[in-house]
């Protein structure tokens, strides 16, 4: 929560008075698909990302009259080396690439999607490939009970 949520809140509170004084600004927040859905083994991370969505959805409405925009990037799997260093429940790095991340969107394509979304002023763009995570986002919006029944089956054996 300290990094994935509170750091955004502290920085936003520092910048907001300047944006309001200028009557312009654009907050671009990097969240995650986990900010919209919950999957097994990711409860703390998902909680922080859900908190980001709630905070910045509210802020968007509060500052719209001051010409301040809020974009919440919602990336899926992006091909990076993050899983090599991601902490496991025993505080050691995973030390190996995640198959999902290895098959994720290359970083250069992710950057292009991000820049396009910022230029368009998108509220909450999905960044990534058309894949299971995008389908999960649709399911949680259109038929939340379906994903709730599928989620327990995602626990690694």
Put a short name on every predicted segment.
Residues 12, 48:
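Active-site helix of classical SDR
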Residues 14-23:
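A short helix-coil junction within the Rossmann-fold of NAD(P)-dependent oxidoreductases
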Residues 17, 61-64:
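Alpha-helical segment proximal to the catalytic Tyr-Lys
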Residues 37-44, 59:
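Active-site loop immediately N-terminal to the catalytic Tyr-X3-Lys motif
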Residues 65-131:
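SDR active-site lid
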Residues 122-157:
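A transmembrane-helix-recognition feature enriched in membrane-embedded lipid enzymes
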């Amino acid at each position: 929560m300290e990094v994935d949520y509170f750091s955004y809140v502290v920085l936003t509170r520092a910048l907001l008075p300047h944006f309001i004084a200028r009557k312009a600004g654009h907050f671009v927040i990097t969240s995650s698909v986990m900010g919209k859905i919950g999957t097994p083994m990711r409860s703390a991370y998902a909680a922080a990302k859900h908190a980001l969505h709630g905070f910045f959805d509210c802020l968007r409405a509060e500052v719209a009259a001051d010409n301040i925009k809020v974009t919440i990037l919602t990336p899926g799997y992006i091909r990076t080396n993050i899983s090599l260093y991601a902490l496991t429940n025993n505080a050691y790095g995973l030390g190996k690439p995640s198959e999902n991340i290895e098959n994720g969107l290359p970083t250069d394509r992710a950057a292009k999607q991000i820049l396009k979304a910022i230029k368009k002023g998108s509220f909450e763009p999905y960044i990534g490939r058309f894949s299971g995570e995008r389908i999960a986002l649709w399911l949680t919006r259109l038929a939340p009970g379906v994903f709730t029944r599928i989620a327990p089956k995602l626990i690694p054996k």
